Amino acid sequence: MNGDDAFVRRPRVGSQIPEKMQKAFDDIAKYFSEKEWEKMKASEKIIYVYMKRKYEAMTKLGFKATLPPFMRNKRVADFQGNDFDNDPNRGNQVEHPQMTFGRLQGIFPKITPEKPAEEGNDSKGVPEASGPQNNGKQLRPSGKLNTSEKVNKTSGPKRGKHAWTHRVRERKQLVIYEEISDPQEDDE
């Protein structure tokens, strides 16, 4: 971008501020002393305007939002007549919406299956499919699976493993592979 374009968009020192922005600045100015307000740049003032707008939007939506720090200093009544001295969230530093993440977890149960946690703790559990830890051999449990274990094994979300591992684990008999020789090798 050309640097001249940025200069054109910036308001000049002696230029008029739009009426809407001036009203927003006046709403924010009451929270600062005259010296603080004069020292602030226009960008800082705009940031405070947006902070106040976001706070008002959150409270209108029904969230229990805390006052922004600059609004706590004066504790003046806002334009709607609400007294900030009576705000129960005045001393809190963190915003707490009505539906926190912990409450959402209570409403919506975890999606992760419980079976993997049991396998790690249970020594009789169904062993994993062949892999480097058991030297390529497929292990089977000593007894048959009961119906509840079969249901837990087949139902539920996928665990991110390969699609064929489920089928390999349920085979009843071991498959033995033989080498098929070429007819040319047999002639020798």
UniProtKB/Swiss-Prot annotation:
GO terms for cellular component: nucleus. InterPro entries: aKRAB, KRAB, KRAB_dom_sf, SSXRD_motif. GO terms for biological process: regulation of DNA-templated transcription. The keyword NAD does not apply. Transmembrane segments: none annotated. Residues 112-122 have a biased composition (Basic and acidic residues). Residues 156-170 have a biased composition (Basic residues). Residues 78-188 are annotated as: Disordered. Keywords: Transcription, Transcription regulation. Belongs to the SSX family. Could act as a modulator of transcription. This is Protein SSX5. It comes from Homo sapiens.
